[in-house]
From Swiss-Prot:
Keyword Iron-sulfur: no
Source organism per UniProt: Rhizobium meliloti (strain 1021)
Binding of Mn(2+), residues: 257, 289, 291
Source organism, top-level taxon: Bacteria
EC number of this enzyme: 5.3.1.-
Official protein name in the record: Probable sugar isomerase R00627
InterPro entries: L-rhamnose_isomerase, L_rhamnose_iso, Xyl_isomerase-like_sf, Xyl_isomerase-like_TIM-brl
Family, similarity comment: Belongs to the rhamnose isomerase family.
Pfam families in the cross-refs: AP_endonuc_2 (PF01261)
Keywords: Isomerase, Manganese, Metal-binding
Class of enzymatic activity (EC top level): isomerase
Cofactors (names): Mn(2+)
Length: 430
């Protein structure tokens, strides 16, 4: 397997921190043992956990107003895979990459799969793009795609999704994620019912072409790019879609795609209960779909989401097999650093949820002891589980301190010298 960071750099970085980590791990193990928790069992689950990296996430993001290019930006999907391999090598928590078509489209899929394999990466869910126009396409998505009033435009969007499935099959992917920007900006612009009927008809055509071992994830979003209405605006509509399409259709939850202050963890619980939780796009937000680093704003909410996931995992909930992926835009940070810290924050939330005293929590819930139920969750959340995460990385040939190891490696400066600088800047999220 090709390693992007020198093992000598990694060994030196780990050597300077190993003794302190050993003491911290032993100390935490003693404290958890007093609570009846086996730290090694928690570490094993954390070590086995993985979250997919979005291919577009390793490039510099932007806003509606401007995009400021960064040094060493990937020129193509092959460069992106190398950056993703750095994240996996140091965190040992991101073994798969999620591609976006047509952004990542190549003529030689065999070479792409071989590159991923050489770097120790697999390919997660495929992402279609009918929210922007690709060069040379016959019909514009300005006024919609899968729900467009024009049948030829809808057929073009359907064919694009079918192409994504074919590309995914060649790469070993097993899922298709569909998010559309379809909607309206003015009252009366769109007939809500007819637009949704057209969307469902289009999605049924895509669903019918899915291989037997594939899943399709539909993603809801309250607003943007349409600001009056979106065709798939919330989890209720998303659930209706999954029910209408069939057993291979599931709801994908992006943490930034909800109205402010929505109880996302309860939505997660509902979708688990009715066997329609497909997975997540993890990120964080303050106001809307901000696509900030996961755990950077509201780590407690992330923990509460994982509390529901671990609850389902613990009771072996029927049909529970969610896919996990990061989906962020990195405007002012090194994307590799942001994705590494985000992957670690997801792992942190998982570890914290694993140490919740579920027997005590269930008892307090039955007794309607609101305060102690809340404190039970907070006890787990306030526990510093970093020694578990770091030890899991170390034992899996990763970095105790991934960001420090990355900076010591000089990787960004090296690729900046190899990859031509992107001239100028413009608007656009990616």
């Amino acid at each position: 397997m090709t390693l992007m960071i020198s093992t000598s750099v990694l060994d030196a970085e780990n050597a300077s921190r190993r003794d302190a980590l050993t003491r911290d791990y032993e100390s935490l193990g003693d404290r958890l043992a007093r609570r009846g928790i086996d730290i090694d069992a928690v570490k094993a689950k954390v070590a086995a956990y993985g979250v997919a990296v979005p291919s577009w996430g390793v490039g510099t993001g932007g806003t509606r107003f401007a995009r400021f290019p960064g040094p060493g930006e990937p020129r193509n999907i092959f460069d992106k895979l190398e950056d993703c391999a750095v994240i996996q090598q140091l965190t040992r928590a991101t073994p798969a990459v999620s591609l976006h078509i047509p952004w990542d489209k190549v003529s030689d899929l065999g070479a792409l799969k071989e590159k991923g394999s050489a770097l120790g990466l697999s390919f997660d869910a495929m992402n279609s793009n009918t929210f922007s126009d690709a060069p040379g396409q016959a019909h514009s998505y300005k006024f919609g795609s899968l729900s467009h009033t024009d049948s030829a435009t809808r057929r073009q969007a359907i064919e694009h999704n079918l192409e994504c499935v074919e590309i995914g099959k060649a790469l070993g992917s097993k899922a298709l994620t569909v998010w559309v920007g379809d909607g309206s900006n003015f009252p009366g612009q769109s007939n809500f019912t007819r637009a949704f009927e057209r969307y469902l008809d289009s999605m049924k055509a895509v669903y019918a072409a899915l291989p037997d071992d594939w899943r399709i994830f539909t993603e809801h979003k309250m607003f943007e790019p349409a600001f009056y209405s979106t065709v798939v605006q919330d989890w209720g509509t998303n659930y209706l879609i999954a029910q209408e399409l069939g057993p291979k259709a599931f709801c994908l939850v992006d943490l930034g795609h909800h109205a402010p202050n929505v109880n996302i963890e309860m939505i997660v619980a509902r979708l688990i209960q009715f066997k329609k939780l497909g997975g997540f796009h993890f990120n964080d937000s303050k106001y809307g779909d901000d696509d900030l680093d996961t755990g950077s704003i509201d780590p407690y909410r992330l923990f509460l989401v994982f509390n529901e996931l671990v609850d389902a995992e613990t009771r072996a909930a029927n049909g529970f097999d969610p896919a996990h992926m990061l989906d962020q835009s990195h405007n002012v940070t090194d994307p590799i650093e942001s994705l590494m810290t985000s992957a670690m924050e997801v792992g942190r939330a998982y570890a914290q949820a694993l140490i919740v005293d579920r027997k005590a929590l269930a008892g307090y819930q039955e007794e309607n002891d609101a305060l102690m139920a809340s404190e039970t969750l907070k006890t787990a959340f306030r526990t510093d589980v970093e020694p578990i995460l770091a030890t899991a990385r170390l034992e899996n040939d990763g970095a105790i301190a991934p960001v420090a190891a990355y900076r010591a490696s000089g990787y960004r400066a090296r690729v900046a010298a190899e990859r031509p600088a992107v001239a100028g800047g413009g608007g656009g999220i990616v």
